[in-house]
């Protein structure tokens, strides 16, 4: 009988730990998606980190709606522009190892939010650095976020970005704080 009670109490204790750990993870995830500001911040945080630092790709993936895309504009050799499209898992597959190996910090320096009902569009000007302590960014550009709120939380539907270049400097209206 004592052995049975000991086993039962151990099972209950472990179950309680697992449930509280799961509840804590859910609370943490909800903090990331409870507002427009929090989901934008979480997106930047999830991809940023020092060289050799693993990213929390589960956190990153949890930000995106089913069918979400990440797209960017590139200039081709002939001078034309094209768009490359990735899913969140495709982005992790194509860029994750490089971000972790080389270090990458992306910070928002300006934001314009337009929203209506349960949708929002955010123009988010960013600066990218290899180390958090770098004084000058190696790249800047604009991330165009499209978000949806399902009544419970915000979801990233798409991120579409273009890096700044000599032929397309960022307009001052997207740089002021």
PLM regions and their residue ranges:
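N-terminal, post-signal-peptide region of Sec/Tat-exported proteins
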Residues: 51-79
């Amino acid at each position: 009988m004592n052995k049975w009670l000991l086993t039962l109490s151990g099972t209950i204790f472990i179950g309680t730990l697992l449930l509280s750990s799961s509840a804590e993870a859910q609370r943490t995830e909800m903090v990331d998606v409870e507002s427009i500001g929090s989901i934008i911040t979480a997106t930047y945080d999830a991809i940023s980190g020092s060289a050799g630092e693993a990213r929390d790709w589960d956190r990153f993936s949890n930000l995106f709606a089913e069918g979400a895309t990440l797209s960017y504009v590139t200039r081709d050799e002939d001078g034309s522009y094209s768009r490359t499209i990735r899913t969140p898992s495709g982005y992790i597959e194509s860029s994750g190892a490089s971000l972790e190996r080389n270090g990458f910090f992306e910070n928002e320096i300006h934001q314009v939010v337009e929203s209506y009902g349960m949708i929002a569009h955010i123009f988010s000007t960013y600066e990218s650095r290899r180390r958090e302590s770098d004084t000058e960014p190696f790249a800047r550009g604009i991330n165009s976020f499209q978000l949806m709120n399902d009544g419970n939380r915000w979801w990233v539907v798409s991120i579409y970005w273009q890096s700044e270049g000599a032929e397309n400097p960022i307009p001052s209206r997207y740089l002021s704080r």
